[in-house]
Curated annotation (Swiss-Prot):
It catalyses: L-erythrulose 1-phosphate = D-erythrulose 4-phosphate. Keywords: Carbohydrate metabolism, Isomerase. InterPro entries: Aldolase_TIM (IPR013785), TIM_sf (IPR035990), Triosephosphate_isomerase (IPR000652), Triosephosphate_isomerase_AS (IPR020861). Belongs to the triosephosphate isomerase family. This is L-erythrulose-1-phosphate isomerase. The active site is at 106 (electrophile), 178 (proton acceptor). SUPFAM superfamilies: Triosephosphate isomerase (TIM). PROSITE patterns: TIM_1 (PS00171), TIM_2 (PS51440). The lineage of its organism: Bacteria, Bacillati, Actinomycetota, Actinomycetes, Mycobacteriales. Disruption phenotype: Cells lacking this gene are totally unable to grow on L-threitol. One of its GO terms (biological process) is glycerol catabolic process. CDD domains: TIM.
Length: 263
């Protein structure tokens, strides 16, 4: 697998997190078929990545193979390298198991597991220290949106997590904008018009300084092409639409055919 420190050539990032889904057999089968697909049809200008469960991490790593262009991530990691943190997995341990990306700050972790601005900052710093790519998830609630506070809220989330980083560090960070009201089984797909302002705001602050600005939230094969067409969007972070390989492959193909992949 490629070294995360050497990334950045891809024009579009297309990834999926499996959340708490898929056992070892299903994970292995998905990864093997994906490895075969990208070997036969490399998606030019596109960086694929998948984020399985911790228990399937090494299984997926082995199924993808050493030379796979597909990057592998974890859904969370602790900032300390080791210690009395029962139930946690450190960034260092995740890297040792094959991870190249660390998903940080997903809204479900903020809501259910007490993730804060401070812990996201610590995790981003730890990921960078160990040469992994932090995938920082930010997004506002429906209440924030209705109050007209979307841009302020997401910019504050990003600023808190990225505080103190140099431009060299920021160049190794991915930001995924995932409005809470648009994600999950009951999420409402955001319209292109609803997404223009948030991405304009993020691009003004971080667009040329980070590795990429991704969108996640009810992404599927019907809307992926339109979402990629939004100014400043340089990738998609997909949920259930990519949990079956044909859906993920279809979106990879859309991305590879998109003008942004050829820029």
């Amino acid at each position: 697998m490629p070294d995360a420190r050497a990334l950045g050539a891809a024009q579009l990032w297309i990834g999926t997190s499996w959340k708490m889904n898929k056992g070892l057999a299903e994970s292995r089968g998905y990864a093997r078929e994906l490895a075969e697909y990208v070997a036969a049809k490399p998606p030019a200008g596109v960086q694929p990545f998948i984020i399985p469960s911790f228990t399937a991490l090494t299984t997926v790593r082995d199924a993808l193979g050493d030379d796979s262009p597909v990057l592998l991530g974890v859904q969370n990691a602790h900032w300390e390298d080791h210690g009395a943190w029962t139930g946690e997995v450190s960034v260092a341990q995740a890297k040792d198991a094959g991870a190249q990306i660390v998903e940080i700050g997903h809204s479900e972790r903020r809501e259910h597991f007490g993730e804060t601005v401070e812990t996201t900052r610590l995790k981003v710093a730890a990921a960078l220290h160990h040469g992994l790519v932090p995938l920082l998830c930010i997004g506002e609630s429906a209440e924030n949106k209705q109050a007209g506070e979307s841009s302020r809220f997401i910019l504050e989330q990003a600023a808190g997590a990225l505080e103190g980083l140099t431009d060299e560090h920021l160049a190794r960070v991915l930001i995924a904008y995932e409005p809470i009201w648009a994600i999950g089984e009951n999420g409402r797909p955001a319209t292109v018009e609803e997404l223009r302002q948030p991405f304009d705001d993020l691009a003004r602050e971080y667009g040329c300084r980070t590795m990429g600005l991704l969108y996640g939230g009810s992404v599927n094969t019907d809307n992926a092409e339109d979402l990629l067409g939004i100014d400043h969007v340089t990738g998609l972070f997909i949920g259930r639409a990519a949990w079956q390989l044909p859906g993920y492959v279809r979106i990879l193909e859309m991305a590879a055919a998109h003008p942004k992949a050829k820029a």
